[in-house]
Amino acid sequence: TEPFILFLPRYIGLQPEDQRAIEILLDAAEHIGNWSGVIEDWYDYQRDAFHSFQIGSKVVRKETRDLYELGEHFRFILMALAAHRVSGEQRYLDWSIRYGRKRAERILLREEIPLLWDLSGNPVDEAEIQRLGIQSLANSQHHKLGNPLGGIENLLSSGAVYAFGDLYRLSGDQIFKSAARQIVAPLVGTLSDPYNEPAAAALSYYRSTFSDESLDSEILLQIESFPTNPPDELALLFPQIYAIREGGVGKRADMVRWGEWTEDGIIKPIQEPSPATFTLAFQVTGNPLYAERALKNASTRLMM
């Protein structure tokens, strides 16, 4: 799905006269709501859910292990909205609002966001995922076992907060704001995590898109715990063994690590918050020192 939600919409924005690019995007998007008429249906309008996780232009696989709704299905909202922007066809927007509203309702049904849902909208917990052997559907390779933010990470990685933001702007329906807040509110407690870029970025987006500063007092408490000064020198580390070693969001087994190089040649785990976190701190406080620290932090990492 990445070419259709990341590359093509941006490319078409730069090259709006490229009809071939538009045709490719619309050719994919027409399957989302069963509009093509030449392949098996992807979407179940009775349950407002996709028929499967494994769907394509040739096969819609309906084996038992495929009958779940994941964070990845949010990507079809982003694709349909992109199709609406380039074509002006109302069906793409209507479907996006309909499906987005149903996903929002399911998110709001319980306090903790599950790793995935069955096709009737029931959450599937981690113990059941282990029993069924469907860890790959839950993206278990990207979060530690028992991580309470695992479900949120799955939604972040598929752009759920950004999809809800688009739907809120287009419809004004408060349910999209409520669902987005349900996703981002638990992330405030991760702001001191040096690897939490997706969390800080989502909080920043939520705060501006929904004009909601209700989390600011909690964010300020986190900011107060930040190190007073940045490290003198960073170190870039490549662990020998690929593994998820921390909780929270934004971790990969194969990611590089950052360390703080001390004068005596010892490398300590980095304590400096991420550039995205300092950007959020600047937005909340208006203190330009946080903006300066974000830019310096980011430029140093890019240089390395």
Language-model features and meaning:
Residues T1-M304:
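Glycan-recognition and catalytic cores of secretory/periplasmic carbohydrate-active enzymes
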